[in-house]
């Protein structure tokens, strides 16, 4: 394709974001909606034009001083993994605009401009093929989200916005230092070139830790997750949707694009650390979710637990784990976004997120109850929904690396069923304790239009996940070729027929490879 479609997908929301600043409230709303729908249409064209099994990097664009220079270049291109994450971004953004249609009445043009800027930066993160360009997009996303929380958030919005900004900024400074070292050492800012460059094993440790500091906060991983519940509670509904749906995925994307392929030996050495932190996150945040009174906080803590499945899968160093982690990222983006929309539906009517104020909503809001049930089941991982496919593959991959880690991860699924079903029961079943809640009308036509598309994709991914796996399969293969020579030292899986831990699954695989040569 000769048309610079990736540049267009960055330019459309960026230009529209400037235009809306000069319009009235309704003009800003309609312009933002049309711009995001146009970008989604471009995304569909991108997906249709993507050639599965073709070149590793497609739709490439380059404007710069030439290869080998140390100056940032406008270098764009995507593989299948980036394609799926871009599709997730452009799919959710029109829904966010629709969710804000009536909820936001103050400084509407600026609000719409912030979301459009966010969309441009998100596409840029996943499409960037220049290291410094990636950093600009990656950190630029802080600004609109900081404004969305700090201006249009709840009562403690300033505290939440500062916490969000400071946490993410700290990790980003370390990552920038590491990037500068990498550029000077390798002599290039090209991400594909750096993915094939072999940094010394000792240096890889420090570079890996610097990148980990940034990506772990973005995921977020325990114990640097404490900014997320506050950010979700204070953010407007659409802010929570895009935060959980896309921004958290930037951390997982960073592990896939940088940590694993650029520092494979260090990644292998730090597998025990990642598994321990992920195991704590699954159990601890699930237990914390069980005692929450605020709907948004409960879903926020569940997000930390679900993203732990991503890190389990990605660092399992096998195909099932990595593919599972990627599908969990996509599924969580859809399901968590939908759950926050469900919270927004009742909050717009009763203006409270306290679970105890609701009950028996299935009587007067049956349509809402059905869709809320679907997203609850998807969050739990019910077969036939998107949540099952990714979690199952991630667990299988984790078991191949460590049976004990897989057991811990499985407890997270059990606890997840506990807090999600308990939330649903308290919201939709039982007696109606509040006359105001009992009088709430069912979903409006606008709300149906927001939730039904997500429900359709959740079912599509659960019934036929191949549509989403196929574009990413070759890229997972490229990643495995890069990381397989690294030996993981994690003595945690019992050998068959004994209770003695095997030396390492990957050690054995490496020995077989050595014999084959």
Task: Give residue ranges: language-model regions.
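Transmembrane helix-loop-helix hairpins at membrane boundaries of multipass inner-membrane proteins
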Residues: 1-5, 19-113, 188-196, 499-500, ...
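N-terminal signal-anchor/start-transfer transmembrane helix
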Residues: 8-25, 213, 220
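Alpha-helical transmembrane segments and their helix-start/interface "positive-inside/aromatic belt" motifs
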Residues: 26-37, 159-169, 365-369, 445-451
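Hydrophobic alpha-helical membrane-insertion segments
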Residues: 34-49, 168-177, 376-378, 414, ...
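Hydrophobic transmembrane alpha-helices and their helix-loop junctions in integral membrane proteins
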Residues: 95-102, 120-132, 145-422
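Cytoplasmic juxtamembrane regions at transmembrane-helix boundaries
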Residues: 98-114, 237, 245, 437-446
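Short phosphate-coordinating micro-motif centered on Lys-Gly-acidic
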Residues: 139
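Cytoplasmic/organellar membrane-interface segments at the starts of transmembrane helices
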Residues: 365-367, 421-517
